[in-house]
């Protein structure tokens, strides 16, 4: 059997044993149990308000309960230890059964609830809550709550600190569920704190005023270290050849200046009055190239002027036709 299935089986068996003890030992003031399986057998610790009624005359009742445990739940050699409850009013299981019996005997639910919760607080409990749900009066079921002191409803404290017990009152109109929650005296809650008056507190050392910002501003600037001084900065020294990041292309010695070919591209001039800049062409024959470029520029100027005159003439002809 898998581990998780074994855990479920153990929990189911535990709840069934608890119900069995509640039915058999209800009149003795059953207050809960603890089950521990050992190599020598199954150890069961019973808590009861009246241990004598659990044991019976000459141990007759306890032997009967032991035989039924072996037959019904297949327990190996169950050993029952009966312990008396020191304060029954602080045991939620016993209080719930008492309240259920009072309701069955005809007590009014408010009187029974207030009387029970007052007895719990008088016993020293930090807080208590009683919840009655069912047909307490009339044909409709409802929930009635009685609160005193401090109670935790959720979280780890509610599981570890709060003692909870349930009981059932069988009435003519139906059943009434009884739930009792009790925080026992001396419980350590996570939000508790204490204020100690007589405590020796070490004196706090005051910081001298000279250690503040004003003292730093008042110091001589020569005494203040220069964090950003240039002495600590090292500048890498580079040669001029390393700084210049240009690629120099040497001329081919096999090609003469006469064999070099000068390529001229047409210049697009997009306006009538635009200035035409002189175009510098770098070559070995600087004198001849300059004269050639100047002649080409003059020819372009003449062509531009001629085109401008033609445009003006066309515009005048168009104006005359319109007139």
From Swiss-Prot:
Compositionally biased region (Acidic residues): 270-303
GO cellular component terms listed in the entry, alphabetical order: cytosolic small ribosomal subunit
Domain KH type-2: 17-86
Presence of the UniProt keyword Ribosomal protein in the record: yes
InterPro entries: KH_dom (IPR004087), KH_dom-like_a/b (IPR015946), KH_dom_type_2 (IPR004044), KH_sf_prok-type (IPR009019), Ribosomal_S3_C_sf (IPR036419), Ribosomal_uS3_arc (IPR027488), Ribosomal_uS3_C (IPR001351), Ribosomal_uS3_CS (IPR018280)
Gene3D superfamilies in the record: 3.30.300.20, Ribosomal protein S3, C-terminal domain
UniProt region (Disordered), positions on chain: 251-303
Example GO biological process: translation
Family, per entry: Belongs to the universal ribosomal protein uS3 family.
Function: Binds the lower part of the 30S subunit head.
Subunit structure and binding partners: Part of the 30S ribosomal subunit.
Annotated NCBIfam families: PRK04191.1, uS3_euk_arch
Protein name: Small ribosomal subunit protein uS3
Provenance organism: Haloquadratum walsbyi (strain DSM 16790 / HBSQ001)
Gene: rps3
């Amino acid at each position: 059997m898998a581990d998780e299935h074994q855990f479920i089986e153990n929990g189911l068996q535990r709840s069934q044993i608890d119900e069995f003890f509640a039915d058999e030992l209800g009149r003795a003031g059953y207050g809960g149990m603890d089950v521990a399986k050992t190599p020598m057998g199954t150890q069961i610790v019973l808590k009861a308000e009246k241990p004598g009624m659990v044991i019976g005359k000459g141990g007759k009742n306890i032997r009967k309960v032991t035989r039924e445990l072996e037959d019904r739940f297949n327990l190996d050699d169950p050993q029952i230890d009966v312990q008396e409850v020191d304060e029954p009013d602080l045991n939620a299981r016993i209080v719930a059964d008492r309240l259920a019996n009072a309701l069955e005997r005809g007590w009014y639910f408010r009187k029974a609830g207030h009387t029970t919760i007052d007895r719990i607080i008088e016993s020293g409990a930090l807080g208590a809550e009683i919840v009655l749900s069912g047909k307490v009066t009339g044909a409709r079921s409802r929930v009635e709550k009685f609160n005193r002191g401090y109670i935790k409803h959720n979280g780890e404290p509610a599981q570890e600190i709060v003692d909870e017990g349930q009981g059932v009152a069988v009435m003519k109109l139906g059943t009434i569920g009884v739930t009792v929650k009790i925080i026992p005296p001396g419980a350590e809650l996570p939000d508790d704190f204490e204020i100690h008056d007589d405590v020796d507190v070490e004196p706090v050392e005051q910081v001298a005023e000279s250690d503040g910002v004003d003292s730093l501003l008042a110091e001589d600037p020569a005494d203040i270290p220069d964090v950003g001084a240039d002495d600590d900065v090292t500048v890498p020294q580079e040669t001029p050849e390393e700084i210049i990041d240009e690629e120099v292309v040497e001329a081919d010695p096999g090609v003469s200046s006469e064999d070099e070919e000068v390529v001229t591209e047409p210049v697009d001039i997009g306006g009538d009055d635009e200035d035409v800049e002189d175009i510098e062409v770098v070559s070995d024959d600087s004198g001849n190239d300059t004269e050639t470029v100047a002649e080409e520029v003059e020819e372009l100027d003449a062509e531009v002027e001629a085109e401008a005159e033609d445009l003006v003439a066309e515009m005048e002809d168009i104006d005359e036709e319109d007139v």
